[in-house]
Amino acid sequence: MVHSEAKMTRPDSASASKQQLLNGNADIQETNQKRSIEKNLCSQYEEKVRPCIDLIDSLRALGVEQDLALPAIAVIGDQSSGKSSVLEALSGVALPRGSGIVTRCPLVLKLKRLVKEDEWKGKVSYRDIEVEISNALDVEEQVRKAQNVLAGEGVGISQELVTLEVSSPHVPDLTLIDLPGITRVAVGNQPADIGRQIKTLIRKYIQRQETINLVVVPSNVDIATTEALSMAQEVDPEGDRTIGILTKPDLVDKGTEEQVVDVVRNLICHLKKGYMIVKCRGQQDIQDRLSLAEALQREKAFFEENPYFRGLLEEGRASVPCLAERLTTELITHISKSLPLLENQIKESYQNLSDELQKYGTDIPEDETEKTFFLIVKITTFNQNITSFVQGEELVGPNDTRLFNKIRQEFQKWSGVIENNFRKGGEAIRRQIWTFENQYRGRELPGFVNYRTFETIIKQQIQLLEEPAIDMLHRISDLVRDTFTKVSEKNFSEFFNLHRTTKSKLEDIKLEQENEAEKSIRLHFQMEKIVYCQDHVYRGTLQKVRENEMEEEKKKKTINVWGQNTSTESSMAEILEHLNAYQHEAGNRLSTHIPLIIQFFVLQTFGQQLQKSMLQLLQDRDTYDWLLKERNDTCDKRKFLKERLARLAQARRRLAKFPG
């Protein structure tokens, strides 16, 4: 029977074993499937989240934030608001604590989540110093040391950054900037204006549109009166980029819990991004050596057991883990939105800096041969620029006018001056003719024109144009001098001795050519006192004048304005015809020849003499060092611009490689 029972039970045993095997395989399969899903989610997370944060962190490490604002989360709060406790809970490391100002420099807290197998590691960086940390317990000491180096061994603050990197399986992927706590009154050895200094530093960060402001406020105070939230509202009135964090919910007075819940649910002081609430380690917990991991467990239990706050936990508005997840999501979304604008800003800044660097030229060579070649290139480029201005071929911007066009406008005004002078003199001429006919005509018969009257009137009219011509010369000479000076400034601004020498030569040549031009102009007016014109030219012009007069007479009835006899009228009409004919020819000569004189002396010859004078500088090698001596700040400025360009160039390359 025993044997038989044994035989009878074998199939059941085998069936059970088979079922256990199937169940075991199913469990393994389910576990593997969960691991696969988890691995896939982790992979997606690594592909999307980490690269975004790493990109901005790398740009910040390059120093791009010196040139442009980067997406960031800035943490602000009044002193004793629980700000340090929140950061400790997020990072898993102890940060400097104590009374008074604890955060004395902006602290960039970079948190990077590792896979479970990797070990914790940290690093503190400031200026050119990097300190690797292998034990989380050493973080507080290293941060204090960094702050003492930057802000001094006292209670002052510094705007220089301290960067703390924490890599651990137990931290979120997140980067925060911790700012000094707001204080109102200086105590002890603190500077009298410490409150103003801190607010200025905080405002520098939170006013940037690229910054999300994380405002830490204790739950047991009136949120409307907190300085931190007030500062955030000043720079972000709509609350578009402000998140409120309530701390110390365990210290809330009984009966006020519902009011705290209303604040978290955004019913009291509205912020578009809303509020979160957390419970971190207190001073007693630290003295009792409560670990951060245990503190998280106690926090969870506190919210689960509290009838008022339990709902907030279920809604994802309470606890440090919920806060970490929320901040990571906010930062990633913020970065993604900011990248296109950031890319455009970097491109624009790079172009502006490149243009500015061109003004400072290249570094001066140390080798004497190369230095000679450098100066030759500088002077040759200057001379080529001068040639382009003289020939009217210089490059100008959309709102600028070429030098020759400005000079042409002066010449056009000159033609108008001549025309107006002759036209305004018409009535005076009529009176002079009348005076001569009635007072000075001798034994001449009526109707005979006195040639001396004609000459006298012509000379007087032309003489009135001499000083306006000289004035035009001076205006154009100053215009050319100023233009050439700008060319010198563009080419030699960083070499003050070379620029000063060029300006001196410019002034000397300008005066010399101006004097020569003035002599020629005055000589021309002296020659114009000789009333002369080629016979055939004068006859042709006179004929045209008479034809025009006849046409005018046909169009209107002749009116005897002067009321004199026909002989006088005939005499006056004839002399006016001769005057008009001669004025036409003399006016043509003046409107053409005076501009030619000015062009020749104060533009072409001025430019040629300046170019020759500049080339003569190359003959004295002993002056090269003196001529190429830079302004005190030029070399530093050039180096500064090159460093900024290098940063932006690297930033552009990293943005170009970014998969997003």
Curated annotation (Swiss-Prot):
The modification N-acetylmethionine is found at residue 1. Residues 554-557 are annotated as: Critical for lipid-binding. Residues 102-104 are annotated as: G2 motif. Residues 247-250 are annotated as: G4 motif. It comes from the Eukaryota. Induction: By type I and type III interferons. It is found in: Cytoplasm; Endoplasmic reticulum membrane; Cytoplasm, Perinuclear region. Residues 572-660 form the GED domain. Residues 279-282 are annotated as: G5 motif. Residues 1-10 have a biased composition (Basic and acidic residues). Transmembrane segments: none annotated. SUPFAM superfamilies: P-loop containing nucleoside triphosphate hydrolases. Residues 366-533 are annotated as: Middle domain. GTP binds at residues 77-84, 178-182, 247-250. ISGylated. Interferon-induced dynamin-like GTPase with antiviral activity. This is Interferon-induced GTP-binding protein Mx1. The lineage of its organism: Eukaryota, Metazoa, Chordata, Craniata, Vertebrata. The gene is MX1.
